[in-house]
């Protein structure tokens, strides 16, 4: 896979500051809701549920926007869509209970009953992998395939995006860049190595990691779906802090350079702000419990936004994914 080595160039910082076409549009929608809107902009809606908190997330996957049927099997499409919704629960430290699924299939004769069965087989497999259940759903005719997954979970100590404080360390689970490397390979028509294909087609929602971090002092957390640079910006904006990222510290998938890792989206690892006392011993305990590495890549300071350095040199953060980029 040397030809696919990911070293994407940097662009502007529009997505990195919690802004950009998509997020400006969301802010405009939220403003219309006024005082009726509560807690919008987090990974999940969080509702009191007895002594615990109910976490609810919804995630839409649309053909030719989030997936292509010539790249993924229908079972992989179902798994991937479900993992995206479950990853939001992980970011809030929640335990999944179940999902509701709306499935849209083309009315132009392209689909068969088996296609829908295979999509739902992938949904079911992803849900079972985290000990949850499919609770129901809907089947409709659609111009394109779509899978809309609503995930429900419960949290003992929910973690929002808004709790980071100056002095906190910024950590990331796993390794970054594999999803971006896989996407380059698919676009080039390459056959992907099994591990790399799984990274893209069957990502693992970090449920156990999110729950462990919630129990061990996580102050703010977000899943990396839009790319490191963009999601750091979202967490910084929600918490009202400046986050400084040292790019050379970012743990990368083999064959991926740090700038490429910072731009790669749909990684579904967790970015978390932890108090200063969390250090090497905490990282070792995390790995022993979850089987995942966790790496400190930066810190929170006073101020606003994102600063990114590469071996001590200030750089422009790479652009992250935006559904509605500025033209």
Predicted feature locations:
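Residue-level recognition of short, solvent-exposed, well-ordered loop/turn junctions
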Residues: 165-166, 208, 263
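Glycine-rich, charged/polar anion/phosphate-binding loops
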Residues: 31-33, 40-43, 133-135, 156-159, ...
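Alpha-helix C-terminal capping segments
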Residues: 90-95, 237-239
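Long, charged amphipathic helices and adjacent flexible linkers at domain junctions
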Residues: 199-203
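Glycine-rich anion-binding loops of enzyme active sites
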Residues: 51-54, 61, 95-185, 299
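N-terminal glycine-rich phosphate/pyrophosphate-binding loops that anchor nucleotide-derived ligands
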Residues: 1-91
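Glycine-/charge-enriched secondary-structure boundary and capping motifs
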Residues: 1-28, 72, 107-135, 140-147, ...
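Short, compositionally biased
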Residues: 180-197
């Amino acid at each position: 896979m040397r030809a696919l080595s990911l070293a994407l160039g940097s662009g502007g910082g529009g997505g990195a500051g919690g802004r950009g076409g998509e997020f400006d549009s969301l802010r405009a929608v939220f403003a219309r809701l006024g005082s009726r809107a509560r807690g919008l902009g987090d990974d999940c809606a969080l509702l009191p549920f007895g002594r615990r908190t109910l976490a609810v997330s919804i995630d839409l996957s649309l053909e030719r926007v989030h997936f292509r049927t010539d790249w993924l099997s229908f079972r992989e499409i179902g798994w991937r869509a479900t993992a995206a919704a479950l990853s939001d629960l992980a970011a809030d430290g929640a335990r999944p209970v179940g999902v509701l699924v709306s499935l849209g299939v083309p009315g132009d004769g392209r689909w068969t009953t088996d296609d829908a069965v295979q999509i739902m087989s992938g949904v079911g497999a992803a849900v079972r992998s985290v000990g949850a259940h499919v609770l129901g759903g809907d089947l409709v005719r659609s111009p394109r395939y779509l899978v809309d997954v609503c995930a429900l979970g419960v949290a003992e100590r929910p973690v929002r995006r808004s709790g980071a404080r100056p002095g906190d360390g910024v950590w990331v689970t796993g390794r970054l860049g594999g999803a971006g490397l896989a996407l380059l390979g698919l676009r080039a028509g390459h056959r992907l190595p099994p591990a790399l294909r799984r990274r893209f087609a069957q990502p693992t929602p970090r449920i156990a990691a999110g729950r462990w971090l919630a129990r061990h002092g996580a102050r703010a957390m977000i899943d990396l779906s839009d790319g490191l640079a963009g999601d750091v910006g979202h967490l910084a904006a929600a918490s009202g802090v400046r986050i400084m990222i040292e790019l050379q510290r970012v743990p990368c998938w083999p064959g991926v350079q740090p700038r490429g890792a910072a731009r790669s989206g749909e990684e579904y690892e967790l970015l978390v702000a932890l108090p200063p006392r969390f250090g090497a011993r905490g990282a070792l305990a995390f790995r022993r419990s979850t089987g995942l590495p966790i790496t400190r890549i930066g810190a929170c300071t006073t101020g606003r936004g994102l600063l990114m350095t590469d071996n001590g040199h200030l750089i422009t953060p790479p652009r992250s994914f935006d559904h509605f980029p500025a033209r």
